[in-house]
């Protein structure tokens, strides 16, 4: 989950969006929760097994 925290930091300091690496569904759910707690927006993109989370600012 360290990569999620790094991506959250990048988005909160100015990067428009960040794509995380593809992960299984249970990991993506945890990523979405961390992103929501940081008051950012996230969406999943792609098809399994390459589905990934993208983080945006509000």
Map each language-model feature to its residues.
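Intrinsic disorder
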Residues: 1-58
